[in-house]
């Protein structure tokens, strides 16, 4: 939310910004955090709307965006709905910039949007698949027919972390492993991980990705 809010302010301050969400804890939380950060910097949200996930036709919302001359649309939600929205915006001749979060870091997004997804921006943590140290592991995944995109290697890191914590604890007992997790540092495909006093994992900061020609990469 903070990173996206800053980007909106830096690039769209004084322009028409819309923020929409799918009413889920994830989507609304992301949208609200982005709007709070944007407006705290002095930005003005021209339109704030909720939509229903699972629908196929977002033409009413898109028409509203068009009527309000929206320059940038932030979507707090998942790739399916965001993909339909950007496709329907392009069908209505709109060049509005679509921005979202980590849920759009999946090849399924482009399968929905086609060329309409060109230039879509999203925030996500640095891609561990691009780390040369993980080249061997990435090859194992691809050889098995699995593209290590999105959260695949993050899930792998979670398993690595648990296994190391259990090993350090000398037990699979949940309380023992939890104590080990809270006090240790763990070597993973993401780098060295530990947990803070709140129990949150210390991960690298968010970076920007852009969709171009059927794939996504760092902006």
PLM regions and their residue ranges:
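Extracytosolic ligand-binding ectodomains
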Residues: 1-219
């Amino acid at each position: 939310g903070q990173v996206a809010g800053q980007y909106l302010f830096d690039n769209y301050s004084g322009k028409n910004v819309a923020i929409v969400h799918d009413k889920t804890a994830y989507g609304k939380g992301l949208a609200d955090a982005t709007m709070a950060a944007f407006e705290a910097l002095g930005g003005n949200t021209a339109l704030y709307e909720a939509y229903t996930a699972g629908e196929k036709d977002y033409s009413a919302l898109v028409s509203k965006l068009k009527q309000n001359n929206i320059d940038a649309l932030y979507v707090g939600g998942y790739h399916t709905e965001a993909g339909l929205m950007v496709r329907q915006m392009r069908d209505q001749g709109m060049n509005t910039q679509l921005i979202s979060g980590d849920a759009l870091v999946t090849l399924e997004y482009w399968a929905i949007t086609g060329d309409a997804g060109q230039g879509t921006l999203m925030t996500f943590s640095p891609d561990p698949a691009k780390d040369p140290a993980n080249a061997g592991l990435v090859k194992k995944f691809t050889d098995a027919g699995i593209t290590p995109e999105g959260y695949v290697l993050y899930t792998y890191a979670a398993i690595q972390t648990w296994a190391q914590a259990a090993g350090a604890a000398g037990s699979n007992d949940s309380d023992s492993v939890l104590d080990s997790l809270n006090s240790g540092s763990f070597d993973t495909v993401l780098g060295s991980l530990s947990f803070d006093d709140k129990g949150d994992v210390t991960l690298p900061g968010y970076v920007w990705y852009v969709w171009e020609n059927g794939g996504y990469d760092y902006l």
